């Protein structure tokens, strides 16, 4: 499906080399002052260009055409569009019948038979620009509650020097610095090594993967459901839906399976504070008021410029040599997308939580 969320719903449309991509946000509350400059600034973070991203030059100017009146949300669907301006479909003519290793081509062909081969069509990460715009709307709503969502690069390829994330309180991740870093690095001291890792892969006509950490500050306790809408399950669902994400860890993640209970448990201090944060701010599918900490693992960009073996639509063995413009490391711009998806999840869960108690219902209706 092309719709995400329960109370706050985002529906996206468009393909990589089509005329435009866009989205409709439904369920956004009325009365929220919309800062369009902030939305554009978030899109600019994800915008292609530069030596650490694809050379495809897109302005990514968002045009909002509904749901906003005199700069304020009016409670109706918010529609917006981003026109594609720099497609080079001819780069894909020679491979239109071939399946690119590491891409969704083969699966799309088996499912739909007809597919848009230009830049991957609907499966392209180009669509994530829409998610970033929608996530910016969600952050504007979250700002009303002083909730801050940020992401940054924790590691690139073999450059993984940030330490164990099992207890994020002990790590010196600088999320504010990451917003100014060319590659969104959480560690200023390791940034050049990470950059070199990307450039070395790029110069070898190859690519490299990376890890992104997302943090939510000032999130209230009590968000999430006890069974099938656990907020950690929703977060994993949202982040695994980003192109190239192969694994998601919350808090200590897989490291928790190596601990003993007395080590993994976060002792509770006065005023509802926690000594450690192995849980990543979530217990029993519900937030506990500590920071939400999540790590997303991105695979290397599948589009590389080395010859690869594959087959065509008839099953004949072929050799694939790609052209075009591709990110040497999708984790870099993926960090912006991870932020957007987390914003949408938290905002959705806050809206869902409104009817969880009789007290909250009475406050609204009486």
Curated annotation (Swiss-Prot):
Catalytic activity: 5-O-(1-carboxyvinyl)-3-phosphoshikimate = chorismate + phosphate
Cofactor annotation remark: Reduced FMN (FMNH(2)).
GO cellular component entries: cytosol
GO molecular function term, any single one: chorismate synthase activity
The entry's keywords: Amino-acid biosynthesis, Aromatic amino acid biosynthesis, FAD, Flavoprotein, FMN, Lyase, NADP
Record PROSITE patterns: CHORISMATE_SYNTHASE_1, CHORISMATE_SYNTHASE_2
Residues reported in the UniProt entry to bind NADP(+): 46
Residues reported in the UniProt entry to bind FMN: 122-124, 243-244, 284, 299-303, 325
UniProt-listed SUPFAM superfamilies: Chorismate synthase, AroC
Listed InterPro entries: Chorismate_synth, Chorismate_synth_AroC_sf, Chorismate_synthase_CS
GO biological process, one term: amino acid biosynthetic process
Pathway this chain belongs to: Metabolic intermediate biosynthesis; chorismate biosynthesis; chorismate from D-erythrose 4-phosphate and phosphoenolpyruvate: step 7/7
Pfam families (UniProt xref): Chorismate_synt (PF01264)
Cofactor(s) the protein requires to work: FMNH2
Keyword Amino-acid biosynthesis recorded: yes
Similarity comment: family membership: Belongs to the chorismate synthase family.
Subunit structure: Homotetramer.
Job description of the protein: This reaction introduces a second double bond into the aromatic ring system.
Name this polypeptide is given: Chorismate synthase
Native species: Campylobacter hominis (strain ATCC BAA-381 / DSM 21671 / CCUG 45161 / LMG 19568 / NCTC 13146 / CH001A)
